[in-house]
Design a protein with these regions (language model features):
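Feature targets compositionally biased, intrinsically disordered low-complexity regions
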Residues: 1-2, 17, 173, 177
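Conserved nucleotide-binding/hydrolysis micro-motifs of P-loop NTPases
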Residues: 25, 41, 89-90, 113-116, ...
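P-loop NTPase switch module centered on the Walker A-proximal segment
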Residues: 3-110, 116, 159, 165
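Short acidic, glycine/serine/threonine-rich loops at helix termini
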Residues: 31-32, 46, 94-96, 120-121, ...
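Conserved C-terminal guanine-recognition region of P-loop GTPase G domains, centered on the G4
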Residues: 100-166
Length: 178
């Protein structure tokens, strides 16, 4: 492209973070929120409206699911962050495997209602086998019947005491406020 100067980054200033988990847990929505908070988007897209940055394929828009891995790069404090939004359904496991190979570390998204399910276990197992650092995000805390404590207990039962919260949801009157 003419007139556009690309910034050069050293390997030390690049982070490749895969976003993994079971289908429908909010991986694409989380990716969209990261892009919005980084200042790349003027508004948040919605999966159900077909307006997210990473679900751009017509089939993804029609089915309201991720089918392909999608790269969402942005800069944060002089570091290039490449978010790799991976599909959550097993029909697209090859894409998940490719995303894991590209990622240096992983965000594993777990629903606050469903808790850890098969996609959670698969992602954790892939991270363990490949030696990748991982962080679990308990997502969808604003949903009815969300239960952070229950999900944390289930995560500890499945994956051991090394799963510890670094941020706690603040609830008031049954509503998420922080």
């Amino acid at each position: 492209l003419r007139g556009i100067e690309m910034k050069n980054y050293t390997a030390a200033n690049i982070r490749n973070i895969g976003v993994f988990g079971h289908g429908g847990e909010g991986k694409t929505t989380l990716t969209e929120a990261m892009l919005f908070n980084a200042g790349l988007l003027e508004r948040l897209g919605k999966v159900e409206n077909g307006t997210t940055t990473t679900d751009y394929d017509p089939e993804e828009v029609k089915r309201t699911i991720s089918i392909n891995c999608a790269l969402a790069p942005y800069e944060w404090k002089d570091v290039k962050v490449n978010i790799i939004d991976a599909p959550g359904f097993f029909d697209f496991y090859g894409e998940v495997t490719a995303a894991m190979a590209m990622a240096d570390s992983a965000l594993i998204v777990v629903g606050a209602v469903s808790g850890p399910v098969v996609g959670t276990e698969k992602a954790m197992d892939m991270c363990k086998k490949s030696g990748k650092a991982r962080m679990i995000v308990v997502n969808q805390m604003d949903r009815e019947n969300a239960n952070f404590d229950k999900v944390m207990n289930e995560l500890n039962e499945k994956f051991g005491p090394s799963v510890v919260p670094i941020q706690l949801p603040i609830m008031e009157g049954g509503k998420l406020v922080g």
